[in-house]
A protein has these predicted regions:
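Membrane-embedded alpha-helical bundles that constitute the cytochrome b-like, heme-associated redox core
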Residues: 1-289
């Protein structure tokens, strides 16, 4: 029997390199903040810096958690599923820290804390996302899976997609000027959702490399379009003028290109893994003869 706190061991009690890697990944932002504690403390707004760090990493780890399903198929490595729960609970820990630090920033005044949240739309959206993640974290144990039943548990945890969307909206709305990173994050989220939708539509667990290339292109186009429309609405300019800058790399690499590069990289990994699996299968067939 593995103790709940022994996160580095798998279900059989063996030391797990994969779990150690996941735990290291989750702890890295915390360790970095501790190392930079003196620098943060002497900054203009230390609590605000920590609030944003915790929120940013919560969003990053939420994306990593959502990426487990497609990547265990693309990498042909089913054991990745073993760290999904750890990543999900780790995501909740960061978003809980995000909210706790915000409470501290309000001088631990419950009235002020509630007033701030209920009078700002992006904070209301963030609070809803937090409540949703809290519900998923509370029901992530094996005991809750048995209590709810497999079907009900899966339906409940499908709420993660809506929660991720709310988290992205919250991130966008609290970003004051440059929306490059939020747009890139939105593009990656769109890819993750589109992957699932395309796999469902094709009724397959593994998309072909060609499908992944098409997916990368389609999602990057939507990312370019979404960014152009968003900037056009925010700054009252033509979206076509925004799109004209997509090839102007002197002003920076637009999120659409970043999403395209990420999508093509995934397709390349899939092609390599497919070829490696075919070679392994042929070698085993020859050995069996």
């Amino acid at each position: 029997m593995v103790a709940p706190w022994q996160l580095w061991r798998d279900r059989r009690g063996r030391l797990s390199t994969l779990r150690i890697a996941a735990l290291t990944l989750l702890l890295t932002p915390l360790i970095k903040a501790i190392v930079q504690a003196n620098e943060i403390a002497h900054g203009a707004r230390p609590l605000n810096e920590l609030i944003h760090r915790a929120g940013f990493w919560a969003l990053v780890f939420l994306g990593v958690t959502l990426a487990i399903t497609p990547f265990r198929r693309i990498l042909r490595y089913g054991n990745l599923i073993d760290i999904r729960r750890m990543l999900g609970v780790g995501t909740f820990c960061y978003i809980a820290a995000h909210l706790t630090l915000f409470f501290a920033d309000q001088s631990y005044d419950p009235g002020k804390f509630i007033h701030e949240i209920t009078h700002r739309v992006y904070l209301i959206i963030g609070a809803i996302a937090w409540i949703g993640l809290a519900a998923l974290a509370a029901t992530s144990t094996d005991g809750m899976v048995r209590r709810l039943g497999g079907l009900r548990w899966r339906r409940l945890h499908q709420a993660i997609y809506a929660i991720a969307l709310l988290a992205l909206i919250h991130y966008f709305q609290q970003t004051k000027a440059d929306v490059t990173v939020p747009t890139f994050a939105a593009g990656l989220f769109l890819w993750l959702m589109a992957y699932r939708l395309l796999a469902w539509w094709q009724d397959t667990s593994e998309l072909s490399t060609l499908s992944l290339l098409g997916l990368a292109f389609a999602v990057s186009v939507l990312t370019f379009a979404g960014e152009a429309i968003g900037i056009a609405i925010a700054f009252h300019v033509s979206p076509l003028r925004v799109l004209e800058t997509m090839f102007d790399f002197d002003v920076g690499i637009r999120p659409g290109w970043q999403v395209l590069a990420a999508g093509f990289a995934v397709a390349a990994i899939d092609a390599v893994m497919a070829r490696w699996r075919n070679r392994t299968t042929r070698a085993r067939a020859v050995a069996a003869e």
